Amino acid sequence: MNNATFNCTNINPITHIRGSIIITICVSLIVILIVFGCIAKIFINKNNCTNNVIRVHKRIKCPDCEPFCNKRDDISTPRAGVDIPSFILPGLNLSEGTPN
């Protein structure tokens, strides 16, 4: 008296494949949007940092700005290392230019 049998022979394989393809496309689009969002966030943060450096460089008009800004106003590449302000070591010339 078991009337709750399930017959697997009537499943249409084309419908099953179509559903799998739709799910795969949706998941792929979500992953692509997440990756592009992360990349855009990185570039937005980089631009904010660059704008802050430009503002600080324009605000500080003095010869001792070398630790904070590059001489050539080249802010496209970040500087590595730790900047030491010139007032801490006044007798040491740390500039990247030619010697006097």
Swiss-Prot record:
The chain crosses the membrane at residues 19-40. GO terms for molecular function: channel activity. Keywords: Glycoprotein, Hydrogen ion transport, Ion channel, Ion transport, Membrane, Signal-anchor, Transmembrane, Transmembrane helix, Transport, Viral ion channel, Virion. GO terms for cellular component: host cell membrane; membrane; virion membrane. It comes from the Viruses. Residues 1-18 are virion surface. The keyword Translocase does not apply. It is a single-pass type III membrane protein. Glycans are attached at residues 3, 7. Pfam families: NB. Residues 41-100 are intravirion. It is found in: Virion membrane. Dimer. Putative viral proton channel. May play a role in virus entry. This is Glycoprotein NB. It comes from Influenza B virus (strain B/Lee/1940). The lineage of its organism: Viruses, Riboviria, Orthornavirae, Negarnaviricota, Polyploviricotina. The gene is NB.
